[in-house]
Each structure stands twice: as structure tokens, then as C-alpha cells.
Regions:
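Short His-centered aromatic/hydrophobic patch
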Residues: 111-117, 135
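Conserved acidic donor-binding segment of nucleotide-sugar-dependent glycosyltransferases
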Residues: 333-335, 339-347, 354-361
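Active-site donor-binding acidic/aromatic loop of nucleotide-activated sugar
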Residues: 256-261, 273-283, 289, 339-340
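A conserved mid-protein helix/loop that constitutes part of the nucleotide-sugar donor-binding site
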Residues: 37-45, 217, 221-240, 262, ...
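A short, well-ordered alpha-helix in the C-terminal region of glycosyltransferases
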Residues: 355, 362-378, 387-390
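Glycosyltransferase donor-sugar binding loop
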Residues: 61-65, 188, 222, 247-263
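Short hydrophobic beta-strand element within catalytic cores of glycosyltransferases
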Residues: 319-322, 332
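A conserved, positively charged/aromatic
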Residues: 125, 131-162, 168, 175
Length: 405
């Protein structure tokens, strides 16, 4: 254990003054790495909220570009090889986490992914520290072995589901009891995703970069290039729509899926949509991208666990057309803030696209107002963080409650 303690000391950056001055409980979040993504975003948002509450936030991961964000918030990062699924490494990570829990007097461990959850569970159980997990996806079972591997996410004192859809999946697939499940939707940063915070200059610069024709209605589908995100369905829908005056932008990198990208490009050519549909690998200013768009589409053919794009578009007051399944459908009030369409139905999507593009200005303005109000009432980062802090407080109260006399 001494060598593990030494490695933990070397893996941690020197804690900052804000961390050392905090007097509240210590929360250790555990995830594979700090690359860009929903899991990482949630961990960083929670670390900042924990510090703002006067508590102490620690994040253990293999590191990545978002580590700097943690440090700016005053949180402590512990570098561990938590992205590995190698059973031996997972076992050693349990010892590393146990040492970290002891050293920093951790009150709650919060695991956000499966392999790290195994390590976190072993460490937390050995030291009788409450464990929280967040179920970020459906984690397709694919057999008894995979099902058992996934089930670690339901073996916590509290299981956070990021949508009602995920909560029902956890109940049905893993038999997790209701009393341990808490539904906490992911939250949007409404300071960044605020129509009033995006200047005309930012929108104009993006339009020039994307070579959008003046006055052309813009349809955008954000999402990495993978088949289930439904880019092909949208291309087919645009072909059925038959309008040549619109611009369709697929925003997302192929992440090595070059064959799928080539397939999409061929589909565009086959439909004669070159000059209308384009693929943009990356967008560094998504708030401006939403403002540039007249319609935002989420055409996923498999259910989304939550639907971040739908919530962000709503926060920006953009009409959304969404596949009517999974967590994404929970974000849309059909016919009020956007529309639901049958998954993988290009004909139905084409009809909704035509309706959305042709919205009268007054109707569009009212839909925008309703969408913004709906997201701000239910899907903000602040609400997500406050609800998660409540889960922590609930577990701490149970831990500290006097036992029977």
C-alpha cells in the first residue's frame, strides 16, 4: 500500500488554495479520461458546482484537455489509467482509488463509466464509502458476460439516470429498484447557449466559413458521423423535399469512419444535392451555428440516452425535428417547441422539414419563445448540478444518521 500511496502523491497536482480552504464533504468522481464528450462535460460541471458549494472536488481519470478546466475550478485531478479495461489494470486501479479515498478523506465516490465503476465499487465497498453511478447510455448487453459487466453501474447506493428513458432501461434490463434510481437530466449552459449572447458578427463569420448563400434557409444536423445518428435519413428526406434553395449542414467528424463518410458523400451525389448538403468536420462555435440555423434536426435511428443537441437547440430558440424515441423525445413538446417524427422515416421527416422551413414569422417567434422557456425550466446545468448535490446530501445524511439504540 505504501507504494500505491506514493504513486497517488505523484499523480496529483498540488492542490490549490481554494481546494485546501474548502471545509465541506469531499467528492471523488471517477471516469476514463477528460477528452471532450458528455461524460466529461458532466464531470467538469459537477466539479465546479461542488467547489462553489464549499465542498472539495476530486476527479480521477487518465487525463486529457479538459483537465485545465478542472484546475481553473479549483478541483484536484488524480491521474490514473482508468481508461483501461484490462482486468489487471482495473484491479490495480481499485487499490489506487482506495489509497486516494484514505488520503483525501473522501466522503462519496461517483463513477461515470463501467470499467472505472468496477474499480470504484471495490474501493468504496472496502472502505464503506457511499457510491453513486451515472448511467449515461444503454450499454448494449450483447450476451450474459457483457450484461454482467454493465450491471456494475446499477450496484451503487444511488444510480443517476440522465432521462426517464434510461431510468426505465435500468429497471427493465437490470432490475434496479426504484428507491435507488434518481432521474437527473443533463443540463445546458444557458450562459453560452443564449440567443442574446451571440453577436451578429459571430453568425456572419460562420456563414462565410460554411459558404452559406445569403437568404437560404439553413437546416443543421449536429452529431458525429456514425450511421445511427441518421445523416443518411436526412439526406434522403432533403431529396424528397425537392427544394433547391436550402442549405443543409451536417456538423460532425467521422472519427475514423471514413467508409461511412464516403457513403454519405455518394448519397449526396446520387440525389443531385451537391451544393445543397455539405459535411463540416468541426464547429468551434456551436451557439452561433444554432443561430445560423432555421431548423435543427436530430434524426437518430437508435434511441438517444438524452439528446444534448435537442436541448441546446431549444435553449437557442431553434425549432427542432426529433426522432420520436429515447431520451430526446422527453425534451420536445410536440407541435409547441418542435416536432417528433417516426425514426428512420425519410418521408415523414421531409414533410416536417417543409413545414418547419415555411413557418410564418409569428409562429416561429412563438415556438422560439416556448422552446427557450421549456429548456430553462427543465434542462439547465444549474438544475442538474443542484439535483446531484441533493443526491450527495441524501447519502451523507443517511450515513451520519444515528443507528438504533
Amino acid at each position: 500500500m505504501a507504494s500505491i500511496q506514493s504513486s497517488i502523491a505523484q499523480a496529483a497536482a498540488a492542490p490549490g488554495q481554494r481546494f485546501l480552504a474548502a471545509t465541506g464533504p469531499t467528492i471523488l468522481q471517477v471516469l476514463p479520461a477528460l477528452q471532450t464528450g458528455g461524460v466529461e462535460r458532466g464531470a467538469c460541471d459537477m466539479a465546479a458546482a461542488i467547489m462553489d458549494a464549499g465542498w472539495r472536488a476530486i476527479v480521477a481519470s487518465a487525463g486529457g484537455p479538459m483537465t485545465r478546466e478542472l484546475e481553473r475550478a479549483g478541483a484536484l485531478h488524480l491521474a490514473m489509467p482508468l481508461a483501461s479495461k484490462n482486468p489487471l489494470v482495473v484491479w490495480r486501479n481499485a487499490a489506487r482509488l482506495e489509497a486516494a479515498i484514505r488520503r483525501w478523506n473522501v466522503d462519496i465516490v461517483h463513477a461515470r463509466s463501467r470499467a472505472p465503476a468496477w474499480s470504484a465499487r471495490w474501493a468504496a465497498r472496502r472502505l464503506r464509502v457511499p457510491l453513486v453511478t451515472t448511467f449515461h447510455g444503454t450499454y448494449n448487453a450483447g450476451g450474459a458476460l457483457k450484461h454482467g459487466y454493465n450491471a456494475v453501474m446499477t450496484g451503487a447506493d444511488r444510480v443517476i439516470a440522465i432521462s426517464d428513458f434510461i431510468a426505465e432501461h435500468v429497471r427493465a434490463e437490470y432490475g434496479c429498484p426504484d428507491e435507488r434510481i434518481r432521474v437527473i437530466p443533463r443540463g445546458v449552459d444557458i450562459r453560452s447557449f443564449d440567443p442574446d449572447a451571440v453577436s451578429h458578427e459571430r453568425v456572419i463569420a460562420l456563414a462565410r466559413s460554411w459558404r452559406i448563400a445569403d437568404g437560404a434557409p439553413v437546416v443543421m444536423l449536429p452529431g458525429r458521423l456514425t450511421r445511427w445518428k441518421g445523416q443518411g435519413v436526412l439526406i434522403d428526406a432533403v431529396a424528397r423535399l425537392g427544394r433547391k434553395d436550402i442549405q443543409v449542414v451536417l456538423v460532425g467528424a467521422d472519427q475514423g469512419r471514413t467508409a461511412y463518410r464516403a457513403e454519405l458523400e455518394q448519397r449526396v451525389l446520387r440525389h443531385g444535392l451537391e451544393g445543397i448538403v455539405r459535411i463540416v468536420d468541426h464547429c468551434a462555435d456551436m451557439p452561433a451555428a444554432y443561430m445560423l440555423s432555421d431548423v435543427v434536426v436530430s434524426a437518430s435511428t437508435d434511441p438517444e440516452a438524452f439528446g444534448r443537441v435537442v436541448a441546446e437547440a431549444g435553449a437557442m430558440g431553434r425549432p427542432v425535428i426529433v426522432s420520436g424515441h429515447g431520451g430526446a423525445r422527453e425534451i420536445v413538446v410536440d407541435g409547441v417547441t418542435g416536432w417528433l417524427t417516426p425514426p428512420a422515416d425519410a418521408e415523414a421527416l421531409a414533410a416536417r422539414l417543409g413545414e418547419a422551413i415555411a413557418l410564418p414569422p409569428g409562429t416561429r417567434q412563438e415556438m422560439s419563445r416556448q422552446a427557450i422557456a421549456h429548456v430553462r425550466a427543465r434542462f439547465t446545468r444549474e438544475a442538474m448540478c443542484a439535483a446531484t448535490l441533493d443526491v450527495y446530501a441524501e447519502l451523507l445524511a443517511a450515513r451520519d444518521a444515528p443507528g438504533p439504540a
